[in-house]
Curated annotation (Swiss-Prot):
Pfam families found in the cross-reference section: Amidohydro_1
Molecular-function annotations in GO: imidazolonepropionase activity; iron ion binding; zinc ion binding
Binding site for 4-imidazolone-5-propanoate: 87, 150, 183, 258, 335
UniProt family annotation: Belongs to the metallo-dependent hydrolases superfamily. HutI family.
Descriptive protein name: Imidazolonepropionase
Role this protein plays: Catalyzes the hydrolytic cleavage of the carbon-nitrogen bond in imidazolone-5-propanoate to yield N-formimidoyl-L-glutamate. It is the third step in the universal histidine degradation pathway.
Binding site for Fe(3+): 78, 80, 255, 330
Localisation: Cytoplasm
Cofactor note: Binds 1 zinc or iron ion per subunit.
Associated pathway: Amino-acid degradation; L-histidine degradation into L-glutamate; N-formimidoyl-L-glutamate from L-histidine: step 3/3
Gene that encodes the chain: hutI
Length: 427
């Protein structure tokens, strides 16, 4: 008689995409099992199927899924969730007409958060970040990428990474860090941005690489991200930083084309970046280059939504070109203070014209591939981590259909219940 550590039973409907990456029309592929059971051993799935198929299994612990809809735990591949302070005052200024670039030029925007983060200790960063991770987890995210990038000096960037590392060891959510020392040009280098590029290349990257070598939590390369945009880093500056990062063993990621198409997408593909993120202003010829690569296009629909913009990334064009599309929240204090992947899906269905099936796969299977965690998380299959979100919804279409509420009832990480949302407890 087969035996497991845990059996997750009474799943009303289990839905998962194939394993990553999913290109083009593959993004709409889902497998559904009604009245499903999942068997878990040492945190990984060892069997899944219908209740009839797994009726012989026993376990040390049985988890009643309450008849809920089961999906893979969301994987959020792009956040800036570690920071101090907030930018609620800028939200009101934007409503009154201030632009993103105007706020940046006046010392606000990213610089406002840099000032607050530089003044915070590691303990304060941990304390302020933890509730954001609680919210991400409560909304069904079981793995999240978190960037540094609000230090813009070597010491604070390392403090941010240390805070992220502490959270990775003390919070149930899975965390994948990214170094983003090239997030913006700090005020002290405004008149000499090349000197800041020198600092990133000659001091920050080697220091962070040395720090990473001492870590025991993660076994894969650290990623280096950069904001390739007017007012931040040019294509030439980005290339210089990324070439050095690649030589030091970093994986590469880029913020590109949020406002203008500088050429960051072709650069990313040329250098073998794992993802390019934003893509709001990406022209068709660059979408074609991206689609013909292993680089994931990560759409952040909460960001133009948060900025009150009407232009969103051309996600359908990337799908139709047979590219790899993922979704993320871009959780950050300024433009997308969103901690909900279901909300990102709801926006994507409306403004990016994704079907609910496409959006679900983009937020699980392909988002795991965007941070190269796809061999462990993002889909439900034998050998994968038992990371599930149980939703109080009749089927997967309702994830994009409903918005403004949290449909997640129970969150399971490596076979353990790590969150029960009280709102759904009396169902």
């Amino acid at each position: 008689m087969p035996h497991a550590d845990q059996l997750i039973t009474n799943i009303g409907r289990l839905v998962t995409g194939p394993q990553a990456p999913l290109r083009g029309q593959q993004l709409a592929q889902l497998t559904a099992i009604d009245q499903a059971v999942v068997a878990v051993q040492a945190g990984n799935i060892v069997a899944l199927g219908s209740q009839a198929e797994l009726s012989a299994w026993t376990a040390d612990q049985t988890i009643d899924a309450g008849g809920y809809l089961a999906i893979p735990g969301f994987v959020d591949p792009h956040t800036h969730a570690c920071y101090a302070g907030d930018r609620a005052h800028e939200f009101e200024l934007r409503i009154k007409g201030a632009s993103y670039s105007e706020l940046m030029a006046a010392g606000g925007g990213i610089m406002s958060t840099v000032h607050a983060t530089r003044a915070a200790s590691k303990a304060e960063l941990v304390a302020q970040t933890r509730p954001r991770l609680d919210q991400l987890l409560a909304h069904g995210t079981t793995t999240v990428e978190i960037k540094s990038g609000y230090g813009l000096d070597t010491a604070t960037e390392l403090t941010m990474l240390e805070a992220i590392a502490e959270l990775a060891q003390t919070h149930p959510i899975g965390i994948v860090p990214t170094f983003m020392g090239a997030h913006a040009i700090p005020a002290e280098y405004r008149d000499n941005p090349e000197a800041f590029v020198d600092l990133v290349v000659d001091e920050m990257l080697p220091a962070v690489a040395a720090w990473w070598q001492q870590q025991t939590i993660w076994q894969e390369p650290l990623a280096c991200d950069i904001f390739c945009e007017n007012g931040a880093f040019s294509v030439a500056q980005s290339q210089r930083i990324l070439v050095k990062a690649k030589a030091l063993g970093f994986r590469l990621k880029l913020h590109v084309d949020e406002f203008e198409p500088l050429g960051g997408t072709p650069l990313a593909v040329e250098l073998g970046a794992i993802s390019v993120d934003h893509l709001v202003a990406t022209p068709p010829e660059h979408i074609a280059i991206l689609a013909n690569s292993e680089t994931v296009g990560v759409s952040l629909p909460g960001t133009p939504f948060g900025l009150g913009k009407s232009q969103f990334s051309p996600a359908r064009s990337l799908i139709e070109a047979n590219g790899i599309l993922a979704l993320a929240t871009d959780c950050n204090p300024g433009t997308s203070p969103c901690e909900s992947m279901p909300m990102a899906i709801a926006i994507a269905c409306r403004y990016l014209r994704l079907t609910p099936a496409e959006a679900l796969n983009a937020a699980t299977v392909n988002s795991a591939f965007a941070i190269r965690q796809h061999e462990r998380v993002g889909s439900l299959a034998v050998g994968m981590q038992a990371d599930l979100a149980l939703l109080n919804l009749p089927d997967e279409r309702h994830i994009g259909y409903k918005f403004g509420t949290n449909p997640v009832a129970i969150v399971i990480k490596t076979g353990r219940v790590v969150r029960r949302n009280q709102l759904h407890a009396d169902r």
